[in-house]
């Protein structure tokens, strides 16, 4: 079972809880979601609790992260979109921290679970819909009517726009889930290959050198992917929020 590259993604119950026939068990996924929030919040607290005129290196990391997301949101949704900064920043930090924690041996990768990434995506799209109707009423529906479309093509174009909008939670969640799942499976396969070859003595160790180099390279690439996936999720969130703030802008 330990050689199965998908074994690392199994959700196991830590504290079984069942209420009214519904399973509310505390699992390893639950544990690492709590750990992700704790690590992210703890990092931000420790690096910003003693704010100095001349920032320390760690304080600079927090400040750069803050400005990075702020500028992304201003570019994606305009100055009016800054009201969503706490949400976008929290999503970015949660996904980034979860991705990085998942890189450690025997740690659970929360973002490799489609139910987690889909919940995050539904939260984003739900926020877009609720705020869009709250701010613009039925004017929010202008989002589905692009400018300059001939009347004869309007039903077809509106249908395509609605389907495209409703597919956003799927594309947003699957992109993150699939990248993290594929990356970790690839790492597990190469690492298992190295371990298997090493068991054949000196000749096997010699043959394991190339797979070992590949494993190290893939590990470095996976750390980059961990950041890029958090970045992409945040960028797309900003773009979707722009539809709620400026529904008739396209």
UniProtKB/Swiss-Prot annotation:
HAMAP family: ATP_synth_a_bact. Belongs to the ATPase A chain family. PROSITE patterns: ATPASE_A (PS00449). The chain crosses the membrane at residues 26-46, 84-104, 114-134, 143-163, 193-213, 216-236. It comes from Sinorhizobium fredii (strain NBRC 101917 / NGR234). It is found in: Cell inner membrane. GO terms for cellular component: plasma membrane; proton-transporting ATP synthase complex. It comes from the Bacteria. This is ATP synthase subunit a. It holds the Pfam family ATP-synt_A. GO terms for molecular function: proton-transporting ATP synthase activity, rotational mechanism. Keywords: ATP synthesis, Cell inner membrane, Cell membrane, CF(0), Hydrogen ion transport, Ion transport, Membrane, Transmembrane, Transmembrane helix, Transport. It is a multi-pass membrane protein. Key component of the proton channel; it plays a direct role in the translocation of protons across the membrane. PANTHER family: ATP SYNTHASE SUBUNIT A (PTHR11410:SF0).
């Amino acid at each position: 079972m330990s050689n199965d590259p998908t074994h690392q993604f199994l959700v196991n119950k830590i504290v079984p809880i069942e209420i009214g026939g519904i399973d509310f068990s505390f699992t390893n996924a639950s544990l690492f979601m709590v750990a992700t929030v704790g690590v992210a919040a703890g990092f931000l607290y420790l690096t910003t609790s003693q704010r100095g005129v001349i920032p320390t290196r760690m304080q600079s990391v927090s400040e750069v992260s803050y400005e990075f997301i702020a500028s992304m949101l201003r570019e994606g949704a305009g100055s009016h979109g800054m009201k969503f900064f706490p949400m976008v920043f929290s999503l970015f930090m949660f996904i980034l921290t979860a991705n990085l924690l998942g890189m450690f041996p025997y740690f659970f990768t929360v973002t490799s679970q489609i139910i987690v990434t889909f919940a995050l995506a539904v939260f984003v799209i739900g926020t877009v819909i609720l705020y869009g109707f709250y701010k613009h009423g039925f004017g929010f529906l202008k989002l589905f009517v692009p400018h300059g479309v001939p009347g004869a093509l309007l039903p077809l174009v509106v249908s395509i726009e609605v389907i495209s909008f409703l597919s956003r939670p799927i594309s947003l969640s699957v992109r993150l889930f699939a990248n993290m799942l594929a990356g970790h499976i690839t790492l597990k396969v190469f690492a298992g290959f190295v371990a298997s070859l090493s068991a054949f003595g000196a000749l096997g160790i010699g043959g394991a050198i190339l797979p070992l180099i590949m494993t190290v390279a893939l590990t470095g690439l996976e750390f980059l992917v961990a950041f890029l996936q958090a970045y992409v999720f945040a960028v797309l969130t900003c773009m979707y929020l722009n539809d709620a703030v400026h529904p008739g802008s396209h």
